[in-house]
Amino acid sequence: MKKKNNFYVTTPIYYPNDIPHIGSAYTTIAADILARWNKIQKKEVFFLTGTDEHGKKIELAAQDAKKKPKTFVDNLIPKFKEAWKKLNINYNRFIRTTDADHEQVVQVILSEVHKKGDIYEGYYEGLYCTGCEAYYTEKELLEGCCPVHKTPIEKLKEESYFFRLSKYKENLLNYYDKNPDFISPSNRRFEIINRVNEGLQDLSISRTSFSWGIPLPFDKNHICYVWFDALANYLTGIGYLEHSKEFQKFWPADVHIIGKDILWFHAVIWPAILFSLNLEPPKKIFAHGWWTVEGQKMSKSLKNIINIDKLISIAGVDSARYFLFREVSFGEDGDFSEKILIERHNNELANKLGNLISRVSTLAETYGMEKSTPIKIKPTLKKVNQLFQNLELDKVLNEIFSFIDSCNIYAQEKKPWETKNKKVIYSLCNAIKDIAILLSPFMPETSEKISKVFNFEISIESLNNDLKINKIKKSPILFKKINTIAENVNSKKKEKVNKSPIIDGIMSSIEFKDWEKLDIRVGKIEKVEEIDGADKLYKLSISVGAEKRTICAGLKKYYKKSELEGKKCIVFVNLAPRIMKGVESQGMLLAAVSQDEKKVIIISPEKDIEEGAKIR
């Protein structure tokens, strides 16, 4: 009997002749996120993924490559394992349908279902697509072609064994009715129910037209149909053959994460097979949407397939993982945009999260901290727990970033860089601990880095307890801002050359879009203060219209305080904040500097204009 403190999550098994891409990555990262979250909850977790290696399509591909099918697939598997490693995916087993234990499981299952009378011999005649390894009806075709591959359909008639799928129509409908969360999202549940209500045809489960597969135990001339073979992997992976403690511990699966294109097989055929075996169906089938690229379907002809290396080269592994689940409501179709990924990396990860970590770790290193009342995390944690249970992964991130926003507002209101209040600094450090733990299923690498800076473990114990007072060192930059993929990929090459090429004394040109990113405004210096231990810096309070900024400026050698107060100036306002001599500087005052650096003159508007006016 499965216990509540166990969690079993699976992906579909992937066709090995494909290249791992954003679609398969999305499914597998989703399963990894759920596995990691449940591990934090102290559950014993089993996460299964793998490859589907039998069938006519593989047999033909192996023939083209002049290799035996097993040798052919053996050479393909490393690219999947390498891809998942690059994405920090931590599975328990990578199952292959060519594994010896799986082939045994399939034959045992076939024998059991056959003995029950749910398999019979007949003839199958239909319209077959080798690419899909599936039959279609006339009405499902598009101009006589496969609706998926758009290739001509092959008319086949062959001896076949059939599974009595039609026998289980009422069982399925009753199960859907009693378990409304079995198929998610809900719109897909209604699609399946409507199709099942129309009636079910018995399923052809064997072929004689190819030899690469698992023979039927009761007729060696027939090879098991690939989907009947593939679905059984969910049982093999946790020890069905031995009916081991592992199997008893984890079955039924908590959730099969799949793409919407294979929902029928998982929500109809699979539970019917399990009914025949007297096994309970999985608790949930979650069918997510498809990814397009800049509004277009991914295809080799368009050369727009986002493979794993391209995905992580844009802004790094954690930014890619974050983007996929922040950008799209989990379950819906999504559109991949490199531009939007970079915007989210810069605006949300670098500006909001990265700056908070940098600012607070610097304050903690400079002033230390003193235990105080933590910033309230319990309401957020309660919502996050429920959203994880509902598989609303995008909303989990929304909640976490709402909390990050509230921490940034708290810091802005309390101004610990001015007050040096150790209790405020502690409250922020404690909040960062909570943020890192909640983000860890999505961004494991980043969370681990944060945990090392603030000295805590990624665990439920750390989440439920306040941060221990300890020495903290300033965090390294977690998210380097980027403009283009080329700039990011070639950053190491650029370090070896002159970073600021000079032509006739002028730096190399920038794109107009880069200029548009700058927010430069007219400001008025309202107050000038000394900074302890600073020989060159003044602390300036500058009005830029609707708000005031604290800016540190190296003007002490060139201006008296009285010369600066009341003076209009030009301020670069969207420069990332940084700590200077223990003071957070929130922008930059622009000045002209002579070549010998003996003269520094503040740039001011020629005529009077209101504070906050934009420089264009």
Q: Could you describe each region identified by the protein language model?
A:
Residues K284-A287, S451, K539:
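Beta-strand segments within the central parallel beta-sheet cores of soluble alpha/beta enzyme folds
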Residues K2-F182:
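N-terminal, positively charged nucleic-acid-binding surface of large information/translation enzymes
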Residues H266, G295, I400, L428, ...:
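Hydrophobic, well-ordered secondary-structure elements that form the walls
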Residues G55, A232, E530:
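Short, glycine/acidic-enriched loop or turn micro-motifs at the edges of active sites
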